[in-house]
Amino acid sequence: EACYNAGTFCGIKPGLCCSAICLSFVCISFDF
């Protein structure tokens, strides 16, 4: 299953963000 890009809603399946963290139901990239 594909992971979510930053800015993608992740409230239902958190932890699928691509090199990002699920924060406030949205994938937030921590790759600055």
UniProtKB/Swiss-Prot annotation:
Delta-conotoxins bind to site 6 of voltage-gated sodium channels (Nav) and inhibit the inactivation process. Keywords: Disulfide bond, Hydroxylation, Ion channel impairing toxin, Knottin, Neurotoxin, Presynaptic neurotoxin, Secreted, Toxin, Voltage-gated sodium channel impairing toxin. The lineage of its organism: Eukaryota, Metazoa, Spiralia, Lophotrochozoa, Mollusca. Its main location: secreted. It comes from the Eukaryota. It is found in: Secreted. The presence of a 'disulfide through disulfide knot' structurally defines this protein as a knottin. Expressed by the venom duct. The modification 4-hydroxyproline is found at P14. Coiled coil: none annotated. Disulfide bonds join C3-C18, C10-C22, C17-C27. This is Delta-conotoxin-like MVID. GO terms for molecular function: sodium channel inhibitor activity; toxin activity. GO terms for cellular component: extracellular region; host cell presynaptic membrane. Belongs to the conotoxin O1 superfamily. InterPro entries: Conotoxin_d-typ_CS (IPR012322), Conotoxin_omega-typ_CS (IPR012321).
